[in-house]
């Protein structure tokens, strides 16, 4: 059943809001039935809040945790992204966060090199630039499967990986060894392998940073990078791995805070030309589209530092998930005001909420509260330890 997971979720994401139940599989019909009453009971503000994912810090102090709890409880957001902590504190944070909401949260993590990137007891896999030295992509698939096992044991639904940026100039590029390197075919092959491993294991993978952060000298955390090349280059290099992963069934794409002058005068993450016209329509991506973190300077800069205005612009561009907006309450208010009682905008909102709820339903988050609790005793790091050892030995043998 796990090998059919990615096929079922992509089908749900693409068609749940529009296809009659008779045309869906049994699993999809169950998810659709779970979603319908949830959406019908929601106000417009409730629906917008489902598109907002906020950060939680299991290793943070009590004051920070209290602030995060307050936002989750008050706004009833749709998901969380886990930051640094250990297994016990992360489990406690997940369980407490779930207890604060009526509609269960999607739980996500930025684990480019496994859970060890955020959870202290796990070893870290080598960076993607190092993994590019493996003789083939077989171990990349196994790595994806093991990451999924680890994440499912902690009830984590989404991993914001792999990075499929093509890094043509590693000496000056900000992505550096987060990328598989300068060969677009290897980036696509290895990125697809780890993506398929995760999704076959029941975790949603996320290709990033669309349309390509691999040839930029500026860090989008600090300023707005500019991709200064023609459409032909963008299409043949930067977009190539994304096109491959979309073909291979990736369920989520993260849009970066990147300025692409040949496409638009706005950053990609807030550009309808990039998000809707290019990714959704031209490249025919039917899955979930998420922004990079909305508190980064690369996206705040064009809006005079206003996180709420940047978040509204991202919504207008067509993204499904708004990641880590600076001011959650104000951001939701602006989007609700923008939608108003416009029937077309309300229908579009329902479609986006349906995609987010379909993610939760397919990951088992809508079946009952017993399925939400994380048990630290059920988490085992041995599988990761063994696989990392195998990977390191394989890399050493190839030198």
Predicted regions and their residues:
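Hydrophobic h-region of N-terminal signal peptides that target proteins for export
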Residues: 13-21
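Short glycine-enriched loops at secondary-structure junctions
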Residues: 56-60, 107-117, 157-167, 207-213, ...
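Preference for extracellular/luminal or secreted protein segments
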Residues: 2, 21-70, 272, 281-282, ...
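Second-shell residues forming the walls of enzyme active-site clefts
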Residues: 43, 80, 89-105, 115-117, ...
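Active-site-adjacent structural elements in enzyme catalytic domains
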Residues: 87-104, 137-155, 354
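A substrate-binding/cap region within the structured catalytic cores of diverse enzymes
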Residues: 133-156, 161-191, 195, 199
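Bacterial N-terminal signal peptides that target proteins for export
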Residues: 1-8
